[in-house]
Design a protein with these regions (language model features):
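Juxta-kinase regulatory segment immediately upstream of eukaryotic protein kinase catalytic domains
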Residues: 1-27
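Protein kinase glycine-rich loop
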Residues: 28-32
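Active-site acidic catalytic loop and adjacent metal/ATP-binding pocket
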Residues: 34-45, 50-51, 85, 198-255
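A cross-family kinase active-site recognition segment
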Residues: 117-188, 218
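ATP/Mg2+ or Mg2+-diphosphate-binding catalytic cores
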Residues: 170, 179, 271, 303-351
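Active-site activation/catalytic loop segments of kinase-like enzymes and analogous catalytic loops
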Residues: 251-282, 295-313
Length: 351
């Protein structure tokens, strides 16, 4: 998050002292992330630990901190650089205070790649090696991975309802006014977005059929390998952060990020795969699965931002910035088939 949580810093310092035996002299807020809050906690000896705060999970969702035992195991395996979680005095990896759940981890030095406009090929090559290292770690940590890919679209029903309301100019709920700017932005594109939703559901159905046939190809997936979750150290080490979305799934779940997102152009997918396979092993990828992940990620992001605007909960970024993000995502969604075509051509040439 860009703004600090509603929690007195002294409460957090006391918790770190009493439960973790950490003598903290200063908390430095780190204004990054979308659904969590982060601090660098500076100790009396000038060393630091990383403190992450999240809201408790909703009923039925994966519990917060489910990925922490996995992180501890990955740190031991050593194939990929991750922040090792630090247990409290009772050996627990999560604590709770003031309506937040808290994890304390090793502090990793480096710069976030979130705001990097362009990356050199050497860095992309290092990212390909990191993806390969994650997938190659599967056998050692399989028993600790908290989830398995089910190709679900939990956001879609609500988004379709919101989209219909925007198209008709109705409020999303009886007690809410529809933001005019949101209606004017999304309403004229509603028919095209509905077609995209139908395409996504078709891809989902195909992914489920394929997934039942090829369970043996499941690997450990990070699922959110983009700049804000990558930290580049001065010595060239690439640290991989934020593993709360980790699951067992097809390699396409990580590789789609390099198949035509704002993160990486579709026409360079083959270049990336050459480096990934050299560090891992040859893989046979499905263009339809990559398309599914491209569509799902775009619509999931769009649904979340539209919901925040429609319900008046876009406080963390602000309504104006969020509207800009929605406009950008819509433009991307309407160009997805161009990217999928590039992907099909590249995979066909590699076959």
């Amino acid at each position: 998050m860009r703004t600090e949580p509603e929690l007195d810093r002294r409460v957090l310092v006391d918790l770190l002292r009493d439960r973790y035996a950490l003598d903290i002299e200063r908390l430095d807020f780190i204004p990054l992330g979308i659904d969590s809050w982060s601090y660098a906690a500076v100790r009396s000896d000038s060393s630091r630990v990383f403190v992450k705060l999240v809201r408790p999970a909703v009923v039925g969702a994966t519990p917060r901190g489910a990925e922490l035992p996995l992180l501890a195991a990955l740190a031991e395996v050593g194939r990929v650089s991750v922040a090792r979680p630090l247990p409290d005095r009772a050996g627990r990896l999560m604590s709770a205070v003031g309506g937040y759940e808290i994890a304390v981890l090793e502090y990793l030095e480096g710069r976030s790649l979130e705001d990097e406009a362009t990356w050199p090929d050497a860095l992309y090559g290092r990212v390909a090696e990191a993806v390969a290292a994650i997938h190659a770690s599967t056998d050692a940590v399989r028993h600790l991975v908290p989830r398995v890919e089910r190709f679900e679209l939990p956001f879609l029903t609500s988004f379709a309802r919101t989209l219909a309301a925007l198209q008709a100019g109705r409020p999303v709920a009886d007690d809410e006014a529809m933001p005019i700017e949101l209606r004017d932005l999304v309403g004229p594109r509603a028919v095209e977005l509905q077609a995209g939703i139908e395409r996504l559901t078709d891809l989902r159905d195909g992914a489920r059929t394929r997934g039942r046939r090829q369970v043996a190809e499941e690997v450990l997936c990070h699922t959110d390998l983009w700049g804000s979750n990558l930290l580049l150290a001065d010595d060239g080490t690439l640290h991989v952060l934020d593993w709360d979305g980790a699951l067992l799934g097809p390699p396409e779940h990580d590789l789609f990020m390099f198949a035509g997102t704002g993160f990486f152009p579709a026409e360079r997918l083959g270049w990336f795969l050459d480096r990934y396979e050299a560090a891992f092993r040859p893989v046979r990828l499905s263009a339809d699965l990559l398309a599914f992940y491209l569509y799902r990620r775009s619509f999931e992001d769009l649904a979340g931002f539209v919901r925040d605007l429609a319900e008046g909960t876009a406080d963390a970024m602000g309504a104006v910035e969020t509207l800009g993000i929605v406009a950008s995502i819509i433009d991307d969604v309407l160009r997805l088939e161009e990217r999928v075509l590039h992907v099909r051509e590249i995979l066909r040439d590699r076959a």
